[in-house]
């Protein structure tokens, strides 16, 4: 009887130890960095809507730090590059924002978010022909990103 209890306890402790080890893998920390960045961006957007631009920029800067680390750990993910471009653009660094967007498009040319945000960057930098090219990529997607970019282009 004591052997059964001891064996059962040992078995439970062993399983608990392996389940904790499974939670410390590299992939979860990569996702966590990305998730933290996305949360920072969401908070920054809310602050922008309230007119709190300086606080929003600080959130975007935090997001960039998380995204750069995430991109180093797991490079060439279009979604990460999209958010890097977005957050960088929102801090006023259009040149590097564009670089991130173009890297993302090289990986996933029809990425809806990148095409919309890159189009917005082109409008902000007075390159309307390039913005219209991004809009044409989105034309058949039947998505809100098309309408948003079209609204920005139409002014």
Protein language model regions, located:
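Residue-level recognition of tetratricopeptide repeat
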Residues: 77, 111, 143-146
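Terminal, low-structured helical/coil segments at or just beyond the last alpha-helical repeat
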Residues: 24-32, 46, 130-155
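Structural marker of alpha-solenoid helical repeat scaffolds
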Residues: 73, 107, 138-141
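Register position in tetratricopeptide repeats
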Residues: 43, 49, 90, 124-125, ...
